[in-house]
Design a protein with these regions (language model features):
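Active-site beta-strand termini and strand-to-loop segments that position acidic
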Residues: 94-95, 176-179
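Short, conserved active-site entrance elements at the starts or edges of catalytic domains
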Residues: 40-79, 85
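Basic, alpha-helical terminal appendages of large translation-related enzymes
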Residues: 61, 174-176
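Short beta-strand segments
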Residues: 70-106
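Membrane-proximal basic amphipathic "stem/tether" segments
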Residues: 17-51
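Short beta-strand micro-motifs in enzyme catalytic cores
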Residues: 73, 170-174
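Short, structured beta-strand-loop surface elements
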Residues: 4-5, 10-28, 105-159, 165-169, ...
């Protein structure tokens, strides 16, 4: 069934079923071990955004899950300054129907551009499990920030190291709420 013929509720059901499939990825243990290392961060910061969107589209996203063992999506935003469409691969956590994403920029001391895009234009879309779902971004701040960030660290422990590297600049954390 093509993506366009599905309701957003059906898309969420497909994503829920996809997320329910636990997968120890072929490279998961390696990624969890080398992911936080400076040489890997430097290398993957350049390569990941180029290859991950293509990998995520193989087999409705199942290949990326099989390869990495981590929940990945492609987020589609509108450029904050340019107004042009932008796409970025991200890891995510689920909170009910919502998606939680964080802009760590691999521990670099600046926010990634896609986070500015979401602040300027909160309407976005996520591509997960072979479907594209419209979402609205909400910046998470205050008391909710730490508990929500900890949820992401449980998925990818390297985020804790990225937080240390950023010093006094906490990464932007977003709740992506599916739209009707």
């Amino acid at each position: 069934m093509p993506d366009e013929t599905l309701t957003n509720q059906q898309k969420l059901a497909r994503i829920d079923a996809f997320d329910a499939k636990e997968s120890k990825g072929l490279l998961q243990s390696v990624l969890l071990r080398i992911g936080p290392k400076p040489w890997f961060i430097s290398w993957y910061r350049r390569l990941g955004p180029k290859i991950d969107p293509a990998i995520s589209r193989i087999g409705d996203g199942s290949f990326m899950r099989t390869l990495y063992g981590l929940p990945g999506m492609v987020i589609h935003t509108t450029g904050a300054k340019s107004g042009q469409p932008r796409s970025n691969p991200l890891l995510y956590a689920r909170d009910g129907a919502d998606f939680i994403v964080v802009g760590t920029n691999f521990g670099q001391p600046k926010h990634p551009a896609w986070t500015a895009n979401l602040i300027a234009h909160p309407a976005a879309a996520v591509e997960v499990a072979g479907v594209t779902l419209p979402v609205r971004a909400e910046l998470i701040e205050g008391d909710d920030w730490h508990a929500t960030f900890d949820r992401l660290v449980r998925i990818y422990p390297g985020y804790a190291l990225y937080l240390e590297r950023r010093g006094d600049l906490p990464p932007r954390l977003f709740r992506l709420v599916p739209q009707p």
